[in-house]
């Protein structure tokens, strides 16, 4: 639906509802921001290129902490490393609530580990972290699963014999297979039709969630839900994924051996059985389905997209690729696969991966937070349950922490001696109590997949480096890199 038509519909709705609702009323002492119109909120201040561009422009006028109205609801926007850290770290508990993303809220409805709040969130997060951390005791570790998947990937890339290919599907396959092995207890063949359908649904959904129309939907979900749009396709996609998860749960239930849990679903089912007499338990079927869906979103699409962007950067900056491969040769050699222990001995490669994540800026304003109580912050009072958008992009491009914020520069993460250094502006997984559940697995995957590929292959592009375009194809909730062609040439 065209922006102008959406604007007209929203404006007409505003006129109709004005008599009933009047101007949005602020409570507490919210940070400054543009004056909202009835129902429309700050629509007229929104940039046609999306919410991120809008927020960054408003920051120039109102500073690092300001309020915008998305429709009739106030949202406090945090920009810059310092403001985000003050909120999510220094006042972690107060800012630990989870807000909604309008296009997926009809599916999650506050269930599952990502969008839950209160005791439900605490119980599911504790369980999920413990299960993923402890899973594999006496079996294969997560690192071994990733190494196995990396070997399968190398075999698949060798089959291409240096032909041009789009790496999107393969990179989705490898990251999805890691979560599948943890959640379902199995990996899929790359040509499995059920697996390919799942991958298509996830990729399509992430792209749609990141689209401009989904950002407009965020402004007026109660009104626009009655019209055709991407929100309906997202709902259908996620429902189909949930059906697959539900079928897998039933298969697990039928073959469950309490003395030998095979995977995340088995462990969850055992917890459900243990708590069945407790009516207040959060371990029920709905939370199982939506927590598994959450794990896929947290651990597959984001990591695969980071890898895709990483290799696009390696094509554009071949001198960086050469230096990474030199470090691989010095530390690992060619006769054994990379291991996680190698990372501490490879500061340049680690810095490159950090810089890929920083410049890739995959989730520009994170997943929305809410404050769990009336909260004093920088002289303002943010009322309980107010939504908060931490603009992670503004930290990842913060010139106070990154010397050349808009340029690919691994030196951002290296000290004068060439050792890896911590940078306060680096927060691609967010911060605080809501830091990404899959951070540990994602960091392990990025290192092992990245180094295994460059250990075994040289890469080449059909276009010269200077002509490679890094502009995201979609830029909303997520930044989706453009599709591109690449050759993997066996070394």
Curated annotation (Swiss-Prot):
Alphabetical list of PROSITE patterns matching this protein: CYTOCHROME_P450
Transmembrane spans: none
SUPFAM superfamilies: Cytochrome P450 (SSF48264)
Entry GO MF terms: arachidonate epoxygenase activity; heme binding; iron ion binding; oxidoreductase activity, acting on paired donors, with incorporation or reduction of molecular oxygen, reduced flavin or flavoprotein as one donor, and incorporation of one atom of oxygen
Binding site residues for heme: 436
EC number: 1.14.14.1
Cofactor(s) named in the record: heme
Membrane topology classification: Peripheral membrane protein
InterPro entries given in the database record: Cyt_P450, Cyt_P450_CS, Cyt_P450_E_grp-I, Cyt_P450_E_grp-I_CYP2B-like, Cyt_P450_sf, Cytochrome_P450_fam2
Pfam family, one: p450
Catalytic reaction(s) noted: an organic molecule + reduced [NADPH--hemoprotein reductase] + O2 = an alcohol + oxidized [NADPH--hemoprotein reductase] + H2O + H(+)
Domain of life: Eukaryota
GO biological process: epoxygenase P450 pathway; xenobiotic metabolic process
Inducers of expression: By phenobarbital.
Cellular compartment(s): Endoplasmic reticulum membrane; Microsome membrane
PANTHER family membership: CYTOCHROME P450 2B6 (PTHR24300:SF406), CYTOCHROME P450 508A4-RELATED (PTHR24300)
Recorded family membership: Belongs to the cytochrome P450 family.
Stated role: Cytochromes P450 are a group of heme-thiolate monooxygenases. In liver microsomes, this enzyme is involved in an NADPH-dependent electron transport pathway. It oxidizes a variety of structurally unrelated compounds, including steroids, fatty acids, and xenobiotics. In the epoxidation of arachidonic acid it has a unique preference for the 5,6-olefin.
Protein name: Cytochrome P450 2B4
Gene label: CYP2B4
């Amino acid at each position: 639906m065209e922006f102008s038509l959406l604007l007209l519909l929203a404006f007409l709705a505003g006129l109709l509802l004005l008599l009933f609702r009047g101007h949005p009323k602020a409570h507490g002492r919210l940070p400054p921001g543009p004056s909202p119109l009835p129902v429309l909120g700050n629509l007229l201040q929104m940039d046609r290129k999306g919410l991120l561009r809008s927020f960054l422009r408003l920051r120039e006028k109102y500073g690092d902490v300001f309020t915008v109205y998305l429709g009739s609801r106030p949202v406090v926007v945090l920009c810059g490393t310092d403001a985000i850290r003050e909120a999510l770290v220094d006042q972690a508990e107060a800012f630990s609530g989870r807000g909604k993303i309008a296009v997926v809220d009809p599916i999650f409805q506050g269930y599952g580990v990502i969008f839950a709040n209160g005791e439900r969130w605490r119980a599911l997060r504790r369980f999920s972290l413990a299960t993923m951390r402890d899973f594999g005791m006496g079996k294969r570790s997560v690192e071994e699963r990733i190494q196995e998947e990396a070997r399968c990937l190398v075999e698949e890339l060798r089959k291409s014999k240096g032909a041009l290919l789009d790496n999107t599907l393969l990179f989705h396959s490898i990251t999805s297979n890691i979560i599948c092995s943890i959640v379902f207890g199995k990996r899929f063949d790359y040509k499995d039709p059920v697996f390919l359908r799942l991958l298509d649904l996830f990729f399509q959904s992430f792209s749609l969630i990141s689209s401009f129309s989904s950002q407009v939907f965020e402004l007026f979900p109660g009104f626009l839900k009655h019209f055709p749009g991407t929100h309906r396709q997202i709902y259908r996609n996620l429902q189909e994924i949930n059906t697959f998860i539900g079928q897998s749960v039933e298969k697990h239930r039928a073959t469950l051996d309490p003395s030998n849990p095979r995977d995340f679903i088995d462990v969850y089912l055992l917890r459900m059985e243990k708590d069945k007499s407790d009516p207040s338990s959060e371990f029920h079927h709905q939370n199982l389905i939506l927590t598994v869906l959450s794990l896929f979103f947290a651990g597959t699409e984001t990591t695969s997209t980071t890898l895709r962007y990483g290799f696009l950067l390696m094509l554009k900056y071949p001198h960086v690729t050469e230096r990474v491969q030199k470090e691989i040769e010095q530390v690992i050699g060619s006769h054994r696969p990379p291991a996680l222990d190698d990372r501490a001995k490879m500061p340049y490669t680690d810095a490159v991966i950090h810089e890929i994540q920083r410049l890739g800026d995959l989730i520009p304003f994170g997943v929305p937070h809410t404050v769990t109580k009336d909260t004093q912050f920088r002289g303002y009072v943010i009322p309980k349950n107010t939504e908060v958008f931490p603009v992670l992009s503004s930290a990842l491009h913060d010139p106070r922490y990154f010397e050349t914020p808009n340029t690919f520069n691994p030196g951002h993460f290296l000290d004068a001696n060439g050792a890896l250094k911590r940078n306060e502006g680096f927060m691609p997984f967010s911060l605080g109590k809501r830091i990404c559940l899959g951070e540990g697995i994602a960091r392990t995957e990025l290192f092992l997949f990245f180094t295994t590929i460059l250990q075994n292959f040289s890469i080449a592009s059909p276009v010269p480096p200077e002509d490679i375009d890094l502009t995201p194809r979609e830029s909303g909730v997520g930044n989706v890199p453009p599709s591109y062609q690449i050759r993997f040439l066996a070394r």
